């Protein structure tokens, strides 16, 4: 005999994750973890000393990883284990498409701050540009962060909003300091403009962002070298060699 049942479909509602602020930690080997904010406050000194990247972010946000081969990988904060302070982190390779054997991290930040900022991109061939961080607010786990010429690679990606000047340093020991506003704002799909005229065979190995009111000192040939003292020039000039 036929039984007619008034069976309603059972709907399982996924429990919404409670939104909260956590502290993201990543060491120089690319092992990442999130910890409770109060655990960070208690272990602040050790956390800052042992980790390359330390910042607070929402557990509903994403972490953006910009690498030297012109890629940006993103990881949901919720996918990064929330652990006790002394627990080990998880390699970025296991949580994203990032491949530590093939690429190097240049800049790591939460998407919430990336999209509010302007980023400076600098390549070894001295191409540079400013890009609105909103261009990196995408759903894909990996995107091309910039267009690179063949054989070129990124040497610097960083938040540029607070800064007024840039310094480029080449492998051959040349330095060029100029105003950030000399760099064009462009789309992420563009190659950029030339920052410093390089001699044949020379390439950039460092770029720095400076605030004009603050002194920035690096170690060059084992001696302190103040970047603010470099003659202020124009973009697309030749650099100068320090007399050290």
Give the location of each predicted region.
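C-terminal interaction appendages of subunits in large macromolecular complexes
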Residues: 1-244
């Amino acid at each position: 005999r036929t039984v007619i049942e008034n069976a309603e479909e059972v709907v399982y509602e996924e429990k919404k994750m409670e939104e909260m602020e956590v502290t993201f930690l990543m060491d120089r080997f690319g092992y990442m973890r999130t910890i409770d904010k109060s655990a960070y406050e208690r272990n602040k000194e050790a956390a800052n000393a042992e980790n390359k990247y330390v910042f607070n972010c929402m557990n509903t946000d994403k972490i953006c990883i910009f690498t030297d081969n012109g890629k940006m990988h993103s990881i949901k904060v919720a996918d990064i284990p929330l652990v006790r302070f002394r627990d080990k982190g998880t390699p970025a390779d296991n949580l994203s498409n990032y491949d530590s054997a093939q690429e190097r991290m240049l800049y790591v930040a939460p998407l919430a701050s990336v999209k509010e900022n302007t980023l400076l991109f600098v390549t070894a061939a001295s191409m540079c540009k400013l890009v609105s961080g909103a261009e990196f607010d995408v759903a894909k786990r990996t995107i091309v962060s910039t267009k690179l010429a063949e054989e070129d690679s990124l040497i610097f990606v960083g938040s540029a909003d607070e800064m007024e000047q840039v310094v480029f340093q080449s492998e051959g020991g040349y330095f060029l300091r100029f105003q950030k506003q000399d760099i064009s704002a462009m789309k992420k799909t563009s190659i950029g403009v030339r920052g410093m005229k390089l001699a044949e065979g020379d390439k950039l190995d460092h770029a720095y962002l400076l605030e004009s009111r603050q002194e920035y000192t690096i170690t060059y040939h084992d001696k302190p070298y103040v970047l603010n003292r470099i003659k202020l020039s124009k973009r697309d000039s030749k650099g100068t060699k320090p007399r050290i």
